[in-house]
């Protein structure tokens, strides 16, 4: 009999929850967010900003050495409808975690997303649902990301005079997960469960009344993330230029700093 897959944020919770649910459930952790805005670009549709992604191809050249070839893709036109739209991508350090979850999902009877009951937890569940409900698309994404990282690692090894022919351990692990996951082309049913305490009673009640991901909470998290990125990316460089390098601006910290300065001025007046 196939087991149901339960995904929580923290591995510390998994063992206790698994004990309460019993042998018909497998509990795994996402270790927090699995998708985020890109690090190398702003990741938000804005006029004048690069929003196309560069695709990396791992090619073999010469004596079997791997090289990385990057090709720019067409820019997405910014309109009144899509301005400020974020572009999320799989977090590179979560490739193995995602591969493991895809493998578990490929044989699961159902999937229960048990992220924390807040907007961050809802966003994590939303991205997990996106990945696990599109097995063919995201096994390819994971494979391409892993190949890109492996190619960059091989290129770095070659640059440093090391052997760059051997595939990395992460590439081997993910390749195996991809092969196993592609055996299943359709995802099982996916549910959202929430509980405020890790007790048998609370968990049982949550699983008796599963729901769906709350898109309004996801939108709230994305709005916060976009504001954080806009302030950080746009204001921090101005501080570096006008005040001092190394200073940072933030959606909360900059406003808090202004309140402190204004209060200090009142005290000194």
Question: What residues fall within each predicted segment?
Answer:
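Intrinsically disordered, low-complexity regulatory segments
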Residues: 2-150, 159-222
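C-terminal or mid-to-C-terminal helical accessory/interaction module adjacent to the motor/catalytic core
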Residues: 93, 106, 197-269
């Amino acid at each position: 009999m196939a087991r149901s897959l339960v995904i929580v944020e923290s591995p510390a919770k998994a063992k206790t929850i698994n004990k309460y649910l019993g042998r018909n459930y497998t509990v795994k952790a996402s270790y927090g967010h699995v998708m985020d805005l890109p690090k190398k670009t702003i990741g938000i549709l804005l006029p004048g900003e690069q929003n196309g992604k560069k695709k990396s191809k791992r090619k073999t050249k010469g004596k079997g050495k791997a090289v990385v070839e990057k090709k720019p893709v067409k820019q997405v036109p910014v309109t009144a409808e899509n301005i400020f739209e974020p572009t999320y991508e799989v977090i590179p350090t979560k490739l193995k975690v995602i591969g493991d979850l895809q493998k578990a999902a490929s044989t699961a009877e159902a999937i229960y997303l048990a992220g924390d009951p807040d907007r961050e937890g809802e966003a994590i569940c939303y991205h997990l649902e996106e990945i696990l409900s599109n097995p063919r698309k995201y096994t390819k994404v994971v494979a391409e990301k892993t190949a890109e990282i492996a190619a960059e690692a091989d290129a770095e090894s070659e640059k440093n005079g090391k052997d760059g022919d051997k595939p990395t351990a992460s590439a081997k692990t993910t390749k195996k997960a991809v092969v196993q996951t592609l055996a299943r082309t359709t995802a099982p049913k996916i549910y959202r469960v929430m509980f405020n305490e890790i007790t048998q009673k609370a968990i049982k009640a949550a699983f008796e009344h599963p729901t769906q991901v709350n898109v309004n909470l996801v939108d709230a998290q994305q709005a916060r993330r976009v504001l954080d990125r806009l302030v950080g990316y746009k204001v921090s460089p101005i501080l570096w230029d006008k005040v001092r390098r190394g200073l940072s601006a933030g959606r909360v910290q900059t406003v808090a700093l202004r309140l402190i300065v204004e209060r200090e001025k009142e005290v000194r007046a």
